[in-house]
Amino acid sequence: PFTFKPRQRPVFSDSRSGSVINGSNPTAERLGQQSYGISLYGFARCQRGRPKSNEDYKDVKFSIGCMGKCKRNIEQPGVLETTLKQMCATDCRDDDSSDASGPLDAALLGSLDSSRDHKPDKPVRRNSS
């Protein structure tokens, strides 16, 4: 009863993992993280805050996709529309609805770009719950 249309083209591609931030994610292993521009899993992840360590690397990327695309999708009709709008207003601030336009998004993307040099237990920037 509630699905998002799959994106035609990925926005950010990641050659290291074979996944994309705002499109289908062929390497995803968790339910709800496959070929939706924004999935319910992505919204839940965004609302809960960033993962605590780089072991959830794929989830970090998915959260960025959530924040970047949030307002673009909240007008989709569906049972959870009000809930999604609340999540977006709280956790996905992005005034002009473009990717990585906010300070948090930019900081997270910068962190991901250099993450290959980080130790596995290096803390990842996250929202306070």
From Swiss-Prot:
Q: Where is the composition biased (Basic and acidic residues)?
A: 114-129
Per the record, where are the segments of Low complexity compositional bias?
A: 99-113
Chain intervals with Polar residues compositional bias: 14-28
Region (Disordered) residue spans: 1-28, 91-129
Phenotype when the gene is knocked out? Knockout mutants display an attenuated small-plaque phenotype.
Q: What's this protein's family per the entry?
A: Belongs to the encephalomyocarditis virus protein 2B* family.
Q: What is this protein called?
A: Protein 2B*
